[in-house]
Design a protein with these regions (language model features):
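N-terminal and secondary-structure boundary signal
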Residues: 1-179
Length: 179
């Protein structure tokens, strides 16, 4: 976290003005918290291999569609929760519903990023978990600046975005979109 504070402080300070909102990607927060794991070091169990076979593959990213990312979901969220989420998804898929696995598994599962070719090395060969304590991180970053700004930790991808943490609990997507 200390390195993140130095980098954000040094490079954002000259550009920030009162009233600004500083977006910080969840991936860099998680990496600085030590929540990135080389794919070669993740040893999936049989359950991870089985469950990953049922994940819908999309052009938007690997998600939990590889055994290593599914293994990290099992560790991060707990095996019972992931099995329950898989069961719910299997049932609701029959009715044409999508996304129920991630809704039940929760934000920790949704926040897991697998390796992709467009990620900056060496993290193109890592599994990155979601950040811990994103609200606290946003508040710590806000405290760096002698300006009236807000900081949000976001997870934004091709499918949409989520505010994971904010220095201002009143700041929501709806309020932000009005800016």
């Amino acid at each position: 976290m200390i390195r993140l504070i130095f980098v954000v402080g040094e490079f954002a300070t000259p550009f920030l003005q009162d009233g600004d909102i500083l977006f910080v990607t969840e991936k860099i927060v998680a990496i600085t918290q030590g929540r990135a794991y080389p794919i070669k070091d993740v040893k999936p169990r049989k359950l991870a291999y089985t469950l990953s076979n049922y994940v819908t593959k999309t052009p938007h990213g690997i998600g939990l569609g590889m055994p290593e990312t599914m293994e990290m979901a099992l560790r991060e969220c707990g095996t019972p929760r992931i099995i329950f989420a898989a069961g719910v998804a299997a049932i609701t898929k029959v009715f044409g519903r999508k996304g129920d696995f991630y809704r039940v598994a929760g934000y920790k599962a949704r926040s897991i990023d697998g390796p992709t070719s467009h990620t900056i090395p060496p993290y193109n060969e890592y599994v990155v978990l979601g950040p811990e304590r994103p609200n606290e991180v946003a508040k710590e970053l806000k405290a760096l600046f002698d300006k009236d700004i807000d900081v949000i930790v976001v997870d934004i991808n091709d499918l949409g975005g989520n505010i994971l943490g904010s220095s201002n609990s009143q700041l929501t997507w709806t309020k932000w979109l009005k800016y």
